Amino acid sequence: MPEIDITDPHDVRLAEYRTIGEAELVRRRGVFVAEGRLVVRRLLEDARHHVHSLLLNRSARDALADLLPRWIDRIPIYTCRTDDFPIVTGFDIHRGCLALAERPAEDRKSVV
């Protein structure tokens, strides 16, 4: 799957990112949101996580360029302008770096 340059912040392919502010909905979908270059980098480096997609501005894309070839055929990698993040997500994501990944199964033993 090639990188997808998003020119319209209302693009339907970004639907998952529109609801990241609704914690209960995100939890019910079984995903979590990673924000920021360091956190997303660690997520991409850790084989235990099933990453669904990335939403990056150009700067974040360049900062993660060394890792993206491993993921380019596996997940959608969306790029858009930093100014579009508030339109897409409802938040001023000034870092321009988000990932959606599968929430790990909760280990009930570790909760006790």
Predicted regions and their residues:
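A glycine-rich helix N-cap at a beta->alpha junction
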Residues: 69-90
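Conserved phosphate-binding/catalytic loop of the ribokinase/pfkB sugar-kinase fold
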Residues: 102-108
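Short connector loops at helix/strand junctions that flank enzyme active sites
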Residues: 49, 92-94
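Short, flexible helix/strand-to-coil boundary loops that buttress conserved ligand/catalytic motifs
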Residues: 44, 89-92
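Glycine-rich phosphate-binding loops that contact phosphosugars or nucleotide phosphates
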Residues: 99
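Boundary-proximal intrinsically disordered activation/regulatory segments immediately upstream
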Residues: 1-67
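Conserved small/polar residues in nucleotide/adenosyl-binding loops
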Residues: 110-112
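Short glycine-rich anion-binding loops that position phosphate/pyrophosphate groups of nucleotides
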Residues: 59-60, 84, 104
